[in-house]
């Protein structure tokens, strides 16, 4: 498969073994890199973007999210993103890998932390109340992380990990209080297992029955699991993941639409065209052109 856009791996040249980096947004927008951050690129790490001043927008998986002072944007590993130039925007990016989180906390807590970045469970943007303690409290914690990152003594990494875990937990609280997290936790573990299964197999099989059998449950139970967490039928959930992955192939590779149709599990490109247009509202070719 020919890659069309950059796959950006974690690369902290000053401290490569830390698996963590802090970057000022305004500095990043003017930094000379080997890729254009204002064009689509795939990230192989996690990002928390905190806006302290100004406004603009950031694109995650082909959706533009407007931001302003107090906005927090969450990008998970393997998503496609691009920045937009802004003359007023200031803020921080916390960039880190799975290793940075997993090496500090137990597996259950680590899995919970990564749920924050799961766009299928919750919206990838949080608005902090600028005039309330919520903003100043978050800002203070961010400044502590920045300070420890700059200090770079033998204790800095441990303190930074702990502070990041607190920051992620605070974001969970804010999302919960804003009604941005699922109320029912009964099926959350099963949902995450299903999501992983669908993301790995949706091109080979898009049928609810297939996933129900592999989960060891009935199609009714599978629908209950998905409805409880994201309030959608299981088939819609499967198609949503498949469409996102098809979009990534259209933008991220040089494969022809016909080749992508076959890769996506369609024997007939005409059926692929109908499937894509049904969910996106445009043809695969038109979608590709609009994001070049």
Where are these regions (language model features)?
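Generic protein-terminus/edge-of-domain signal
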Residues: 1-59, 63-65
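A hydrophobic/aromatic-rich effector-binding and dimerization subdomain
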Residues: 5-13, 17, 86-147
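Short beta-strand His + acidic residue motifs that chelate non-heme Fe in jelly-roll/DSBH
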Residues: 57-59, 75, 81-86
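Short acidic-glycine-tyrosine-enriched beta hairpin
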Residues: 62-74
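Short hydrophobic/aromatic patch on the recognition helix
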Residues: 70, 222-223, 271-272, 276
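Basic, amphipathic alpha-helical hairpins
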Residues: 146-153, 170-179, 193-207, 225-230, ...
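All-alpha amphipathic helical-bundle segments outside canonical DNA-binding/catalytic cores
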Residues: 149-162, 184-186
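Terminal helix-turn-helix DNA-binding modules in bacterial transcription factors
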Residues: 228-273, 286-292
